[in-house]
Amino acid sequence: MTAATPDRRAIITEALHKIDDLTARLEIAEKSSSEPIAVIGMGCRFPGGVNNPEQFWDLLCAGRSGIVRVPAQRWDADAYYCDDHTVPGTICSTEGGFLTSWQPDEFDAEFFSISPREAAAMDPQQRLLIEVAWEALEDAGVPQHTIRGTQTSVFVGVTAYDYMLTLAGRLRPVDLDAYIPTGNSANFAAGRLAYILGARGPAVVIDTACSSSLVAVHLACQSLRGRESDMALVGGTNLLLSPGPSIACSRWGMLSPEGRCKTFDASADGYVRGEGAAVVVLKRLDDAVRDGNRILAVVRGSAVNQDGASSGVTVPNGPAQQALLAKALTSSKLTAADIDYVEAHGTGTPLGDPIELDSLSKVFSDRAGSDQLVIGSVKTNLGHLEAAAGVAGLMKAVLAVHNGYIPRHLNFHQLTPHASEAASRLRIAADGIDWPTTGRPRRAGVSSFGVSGTNAHVVIEQAPDPMAAAGTEPQRGPVPAVSTLVVFGKTAPRVAATASVLADWLDGPGAAVPLADVAHTLNHHRARQTRFGTVAAVDRRQAVIGLRALAAGQSAPGVVAPREGSIGGGTVFVYSGRGSQWAGMGRQLLADEPAFAAAIAELEPEFVAQGGFSLRDVIAGGKELVGIEQIQLGLIGMQLALTALWRSYGVTPDAVIGHSMGEVAAAVVAGALTPAQGLRVTAVRSRLMAPLSGQGTMALLELDAEATEALIADYPEVSLGIYASPRQTVISGPPLLIDELIDKVRQQNGFATRVNIEVAPHNPAMDALQPAMRSELADLTPQPPTIPIISTTYADLGISLGSGPRFDAEHWATNMRNPVRFHQAIAHAGADHHTFIEISAHPLLTHSISDTLRASYDVDNYLRIGTLQRDAHDTLEFHTNLNTTCLLYTSPSTRD
């Protein structure tokens, strides 16, 4: 007996483990059957000029109707009209819910890489669906390229075949090709969308007539809960392209002769057919919170059933509707008292309305102290969108729950007398209603009943408090001083069109959205196309001005237009000499850009030691640099800090070139000198030159080297100091002689002007300074550069020196005396490098760079830009130039 005891304990222990395992599995199963689903994005085209959810909400809140006379492009309303619906071949109404802002032939086939021939064969319902689905993803902040290869599903409601019927009557047998079936078979509505996006989840088309798109929502939620999908695009599409279906509906007695859906009203006499498309983007709530998605509402549960054997195949079944509503509440783990509003099917037929009212009154009779159930129907605004009706109702409910307002239900004056007395306890939203305060999340139900008997009901709930999910999205840091808006398009005209739309949105519906948030969405949550332009702006007004300029193909501060053609590889940082300084340079960067501020702070001790002044104080105070020493030290300090700024945004040099004293900064950036050594070289050079201040100057001439040599042949004290470009040179020498030569050139109708400098470097005047330069820098210990330096100090650019110049004392003595061979250095670099960025407080060399490249290469294959601009907004100017470099790549910088 004793020996058997451990066996019993083992059995009991094993049994308990199995119970725990089964309990855990049951909990998982229960969760998967009722897991909340987030609505994270929506797109639509509806009657009333509605192109997006914001415009849809505006229409609803304004109590507007989208019903219009049948457009002449569809059919001749008068030719088919007859007030007697029993007359064959006629229609008892001339009205409909037609799209006024989109036409079937407006599809942008090229954008979706669809050939014109294939697009022409496609049912316009498919064309419309593709565009709206794309916009829904944009609304969700899901870049379309991120869907490729993922378990993203597509569930679409489609019922009409107007286009195929039209083609069948028009095309001859010889006109039929492979595009006709693929363009008109309903299954391709989902399959083609999945193909365009590269989605790998289920792609299913549902046809349950009027309930198609809400049944699609139910199936999508099941797919998400079952882990068959990780995200779902769900919608419906419907276009009225032929009078045939309207003739049939009229004979059936379903259409309103007045052309209005008077849902639940005593005068209801039928519905108005409508067209449109809508798509919602769904995701498991936990995943949406984890990924930082904006959540518009949450699907708590849903149900689908069938009328079964009612009094007729098209007659609604009250008990079936009641069972559906009860099942949806059970699926949501809610009671009738938890629901505040129901977006009803509500077609406005004398038969269907009373049955639906009675079903609602019976299921929601037990309100347990809650306010009256409010009901309404979007069909009074849009008409009956048939396959798209369910998702249109869902969108209205989502917007109502999200905004805490129930829009007005149109065309209602007196409750239909055909409903039971209990229906009078329902509150029809004859006026707009602020959502009742209940102390719990706002909740709504959405019904959609198919004419063939398949019914759907979805229960939605207000999204959770965003603060509850704080920290789930990666922190974006402080709001940037300048925001960059990236505007994509497959072609430059499409970029312009998008910029125009975005400008209108920023000036209107998006006026309250922070500019930094707009930039973040555009830069991180939009599909990246082959062309893009950028607008950098410090505020909304400047952003709108920039976007309108981009749309018009005009220049404006902060605007970088799409670039045509390609740029080769290789980036050169070019460091100018004197002349780029100005009071206030870098002050805005010091406040806005941490990398720039950190570089200035790192250099500060050396400035105090070498120059006896604080560069930070000069920059922060917007002061002038005074005297040779301050100017030269201040410029190299700016150049090193600007280099750090470029590098902080991922732009780094493959080679460096220094112009005159700019070669010191180039040597530091290349690693040949430390910053302290670079400042020392600059301080020694400027200190030695200071006594010569006022004894020399320079002049820029629009002459090539040969003409300049001839010009100065009789002036031994004047030298050709700089080979600027193939057609420009700079001479150096005593002021009186330089002025005399300037006059000579001008007398020959040539261009000549003084350079703002008070000494004459690269001139025999420097000979006397060279020994002291060698002596004071004798202990300088440079290192081999880690980045190639193309030296402007030597006739052969330093190439004959094996591994290049040593950048020791001898080099810097030679640098101050020899002519600057800038033209030759740029021409040499142009063979392997295609981007030239001048690192300075104001561009002095970009013109010479362009001239030099143009003489030897196709200049359109090169980019030449500066960094800052005199008296301009530092941060804005830098980001504009940064954005210009981003056009070299297939995608822009991911920084905002």
What is the predicted function of each stretch?
Residues 301-302, 306-311, 598, 618-839, ...:
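Acyltransferase
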Residues 352-357, 844-854:
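Short Gly/Thr/Asp-enriched flexible loops that form oxyanion-binding sites at enzyme active sites
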Residues 2-477, 504, 526, 623, ...:
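Condensing-enzyme catalytic core of the thiolase-fold
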Residues 39-40, 574-575, 836-838:
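Short hydrophobic beta-strand that contains or immediately precedes a catalytic carboxylate
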Residues 863-884:
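Short, flexible loop segments at boundaries between secondary-structure elements
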Residues 187-190, 564-657, 661, 731, ...:
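Helix-rich "cap/lid" substructures immediately adjacent to catalytic or cofactor-binding pockets
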Residues 133, 576-579, 889-894:
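Conserved adenylation A10 loop of the ANL superfamily
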Residues 2-13, 33-36, 335-338, 380, ...:
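Acyltransferase loading domain of fatty acid and polyketide assembly lines
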